[in-house]
C-alpha cells in the first residue's frame, strides 16, 4: 500500500468466509438497455482488522497507539518479537544476484559458511551467477565481466550492516542486511533479503501508511506490520523466504523507502507485537473499513462498527463510480443483454445490509451468480460494500 489513499495489502484479505445474512429487501435492480449504473460504496479493502484511515481518525481523537490496536484487535495480548526475517524481492526477475560495488562488501558461500571480503580491484558491480554446469560463481565487472571465485553453494552479499544496492530489471534499490540467492522447492532461483525484523519494518511502514500522519497512528501501523511479519515468519511462504515484498503480503521498499518519522515509530515500538494464544496474531489491516469492520477468520477480527473511519480526511469512507451496462455484459458475456442485478446475500452490518457476499446477474442469455469479492475484483471496485442506482 502506498500513499493516500492508503491501499490495502491484498494477501491480508485471506480469511475464512463468514455465514452471510440474507439480502436486504429490495436488493434487486432492473436494467434497461443502455443503462448507466451508479455504484455507491463504503470503504477500501477487505475490512478485516485495523482500518488505516480509522487509525488516523482515532489518533486525531486522542487515542494512543495501544488503544487503537486494542479497538481493532480485541482480545489480543502484548508480547515481543525480534530476530530476522527473509523477504522475497520480486523486482529481481533474473537468475543472477547483481549488486553495485561498495566499500566493505563481502560474499558468503552458503554451503560452507565462509565469508570472503571482495577486493578493491576497480569493480563497478559484483554478481553471483549460475553456469550451465550448475556451479555458482562470483563475477565482477570493470569494462567487462571477470570470474573471481566458484562457490560450493549459493552466494550472499553483506556490507557489515550498511545498505547494498541491488540491480534489477525494474531499477536499482538499496537494502539493509544481506542479499542472497534462494532456491525454491520448485527449483526457481530468487533474490532474498535477510535482515533484522525492525529494519525490515522501516521499509514497510511508510509504504503502508503516510509517515506524516499522527504518531499514534503510525505507531499502531508499525505494531500491526511487525505482528503480521512475525505471524508470516511462523507460517513461511516458501523454503527460500518467509514473506514477499508486495501487497500480497506487505509492501516493502527496502532502505530507499525509509522515512524519519516512520523510522521513529518503529523505534518507539521496538519489538512490540500482539499475541493470540501466545503466538503472533494474524493482524490483517486495510485502507478503510467504511464504518464497519468485516469479520475475519479468528475471534480477534470481529465485525464491529468503526466510529473512527469517517473523519473528514478519508476520501474512501464513501465513494461512487458510474459504469455502463455494457461493462458488466462484457465482463460476464454468458448473461447476454443485462436485465437484472439481484444481491442474494450480505453480511448484515451497516448501510444497505452490509458487504455483498453474492449477487446474481440475469440477462437475455442466462444468469451468473458471483461472489462479492469476484464482482469487486473484476470491476476494480474499492470494496464489496456497495449498492446500485440505475438510470
Task: Describe these PLM feature segments.
Residues 2-391:
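Conserved, single-site charged/polar hotspot
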